[in-house]
């Protein structure tokens, strides 16, 4: 067993190759949070499969084979929660299973509460109900979520901006997947993604709250018996794209136009000048005192809000704002001027 202590007072231990356990001890909360994160390379088809899988895992399992049974059991655990999400971190996609439960010290005579929760998580992860009707229900939910994002002009501009700037690279891949790919997925695709996730993904188990280290370590080992894996999945990289001054315009019958601009910083999060870049971004467009806010909003009254954001894991920087269509060119010109 390998142990390491972080600068923030946490502890990291290696359970087996490719599986790490992170303890974040704090007395601030009256509950204990558990996060199980599966990390794999970000691929278009796999991203959609894993997004579906995340929904299916938290929907029902073989022991609790209906939504009601799942909900009723969580209620028995004093309102414990269970949810899942997918997210992109540079060249990787994370499937995160999260649960939260009241600390047993606040429940008289319920010291086995954590044992019950870990048994439940074991069922969820190792005995999922991957069936056709669950797939179709989850597909409908995920499709609606993606379409809602596309209906939002600001979010759509961001998505399309990243897709254009990251064409042929990880930056251009949505961690949720796209509707076309989603509708073509079969149950076998999801089952294959599940097996790959369980057997090959790099896994981080994070536990936050007030608890006994030894007891928690024993619970993790007993109920989350992940096998060793050799794969190493990196997250940060530098996007490689030869685009220069590319522009894409789409039209909708709406009052305000949304703008997304992307630059490649060529600075990864482990580069020596990364923190200098963060300071530069703060000055450029992260706060109300920044150049973008003062020049574009305050002095020229072209928009209500404007901000820049580092897309750190991809070595990129984005600027988003919404303006009247007659002010698009002037706004873009001012943004470029402040950037220079």
Predicted regions located by residue number:
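Active-site SXXK
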Residues: 51-60
């Amino acid at each position: 067993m390998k142990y390491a202590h972080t600068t923030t007072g946490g502890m990291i231990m290696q359970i087996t190759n490719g599986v790490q356990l992170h303890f974040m001890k704090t007395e601030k909360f009256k509950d204990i949070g558990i996060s199980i994160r599966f990390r794999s390379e970000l691929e278009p088809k796999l991203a959609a499969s894993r997004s579906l899988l995340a929904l299916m895992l938290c929907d029902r399992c073989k022991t609790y084979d209906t939504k009601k049974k799942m909900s009723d059991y969580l209620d028995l655990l004093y309102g414990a929660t269970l949810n899942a999400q997918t997210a992109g971190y540079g060249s990787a996609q994370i499937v995160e299973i999260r649960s939260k439960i009241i600390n047993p010290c606040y429940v008289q005579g319920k010291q086995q509460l954590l044992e019950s929760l870990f048994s439940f998580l074991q069922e969820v992860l190792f005995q999922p109900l991957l069936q056709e009707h669950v797939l179709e229900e989850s597909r409908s939910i995920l499709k609606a979520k993606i379409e809602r994002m596309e209906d939002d002009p600001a979010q759509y501009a961001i998505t399309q901006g990243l897709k254009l700037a990251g064409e042929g690279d990880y930056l251009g891949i949505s961690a949720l997947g796209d509707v076309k790919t989603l509708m073509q997925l079969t149950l076998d695709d999801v089952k294959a993604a599940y097996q790959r996730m369980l057997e090959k993904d790099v896994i981080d188990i994070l536990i936050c709250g007030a608890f006994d280290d030894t007891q928690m370590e024993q619970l993790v080992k007993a109920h989350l018996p992940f096998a060793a894996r050799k794969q190493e999945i990196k997250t940060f990289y530098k996007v490689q794209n030869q685009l220069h001054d590319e522009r894409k315009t789409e039209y909708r019958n709406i009052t305000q136009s949304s703008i997304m601009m992307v630059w490649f910083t060529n600075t990864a999060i482990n580069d020596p000048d990364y923190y200098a870049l963060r300071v530069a971004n703060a000055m450029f467009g992260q706060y109300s005192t920044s150049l973008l806010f003062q020049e574009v909003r305050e002095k020229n009254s072209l928009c209500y809000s404007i901000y820049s954001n580092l897309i750190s894991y991809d070595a990129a920087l984005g600027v988003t704002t919404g303006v009247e269509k007659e002010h698009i060119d002037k706004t873009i010109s001012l943004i470029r001027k402040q950037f220079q």
